[in-house]
From Swiss-Prot:
Family indicated by similarity: Belongs to the universal ribosomal protein uS5 family.
Organism: Bordetella avium (strain 197N)
Domain text: The N-terminal domain interacts with the head of the 30S subunit; the C-terminal domain interacts with the body and contacts protein S4. The interaction surface between S4 and S5 is involved in control of translational fidelity.
Stated name of the protein: Small ribosomal subunit protein uS5
Lineage: Bacteria, Pseudomonadati, Pseudomonadota, Betaproteobacteria, Burkholderiales
Cross-referenced PROSITE patterns: RIBOSOMAL_S5 (PS00585), S5_DSRBD (PS50881)
Role: With S4 and S12 plays an important role in translational accuracy.
GO BP terms, alphabetized: translation
Gene Ontology terms, MF aspect: rRNA binding; structural constituent of ribosome
Amino acid sequence: MAKVQGKNAAEKENDDGLREKMIAVNRVSKVVKGGRTMSFAALTVVGDGDGRIGMGKGKAREVPVSVQKAMEQARRGMFKVALKNGTLYHTVVGKHGASTVLISPAAEGTGVIAGGPMRAIFEVMGVRNVVAKSLGSSNPYNMVRATLNGLRNSLTPSEVAAKRGKSVEEILG
């Protein structure tokens, strides 16, 4: 199983201003009557460095083709996360399958304190200060999905105020 994670993860910036990062490449096999058919499954994340993030997975007989498919899927599925000075507005919990991630905002100068696939997500998204903890399964796919689910559920103070029918000043105290 060839996994690419952490500092070794392939990262590049395109001419369209998007940062791409490959999180994992797995060799998978399909058993057929004539033997095993080998192919590769790639997991990637794409971000613009300003709060937009998307993840994709691609599968093909060759590694470059699977990575390319994953990048295309990630570009199509991008969504916006509200950031405040390079960090989040509040603590969020994300779940997917057996993976649970706890993501907390951090003060300026803290840096990205997160492991594995979560670090790649925050780097391409443009988050500079965050503390994240992975609980449960450390499967890269589940961790990425759990992180994105948590980020999707984050709200700005104005959104919280609108939900509660109060003003932003009342929410912030």
